[in-house]
Amino acid sequence: MPASIFVFADLHLGHPDSPGLRWALQELEAAANSGATACVCLGDIIDRNATASECVPQVRTVLDRAVELFNEVHFISGNHDTHDELDFPPEVTVHSTQVHTFQIGETTVLSAAAATDPDLRRLQLPPRPSDAPFLGLLHSSVTGEFSHAICLPLSVDQLRACGADAWILGHVHSPLTLADAPFIGWVGMGNGLLFDPDTCHVTRLPN
């Protein structure tokens, strides 16, 4: 059975508007109960202005729980995450800032983590490698009109040109959808998305 993938982003622990540790733990439980077997944090799990002594242990608590609930857990940093030395469980795969692909079950995932704050790099994205399910994950402001800060800028056309079945994005805090076919949109703060490799559809986890 293909692994369904749960994605969350922009938790921003330590920010006044963060949904908080309790929400994160409940969302992980809800995703696991929905049938997701893999979990991806798509950046900004901690706020750049967070008190590290308080919030870095909270990050570890979230990721420890994810490891307990899912067969695999992946971390793709956002621009805010670059300010702190985060403590990762050994079971968590922390991804490179370079463009790369990796496998979650039968799904090929294309990604690159943010390296700096801001991260102004313009990435060169490769084309679809095969007929297998293909998911793009990026912490990006895209063309910037929905963001206060630039992060890994690119266009919707560049995302489409890769041929991915969906692009799930972090960085913008509102759960906005830029395109429906294929899905291109931001998770949003206080939200979670599910990618089903059987259908290649993206759905929002009910709050």
Residue ranges and their predicted role:
Residues 7-9, 39-44, 72-79, 84, ...:
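Active-site neighborhood of phospho(di)ester-bond hydrolases with catalytic His/Asp-centered motifs
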Residues 81-157, 198-199, 205-206:
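Conserved catalytic scaffold of divalent metal-dependent phosphoesterases
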Residues 35-36, 108, 163:
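Short loop/turn motifs at secondary-structure junctions
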Residues 1-58, 130:
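N-terminal active-site segment of His-dependent metallophosphoesterases
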Residues 58-70, 156-163:
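Catalytic-core regions built around general acid/base machinery
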Residues 62-73, 179-189:
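Short acidic, glycine/proline-enriched helix-loop-strand junctions
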Residues 16-18, 43-63, 77-97, 147-148, ...:
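Metal-dependent catalytic neighborhoods of phosphoester/phosphodiester hydrolases
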Residues 148-205:
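Conserved beta-sheet core of the metallophosphoesterase superfamily
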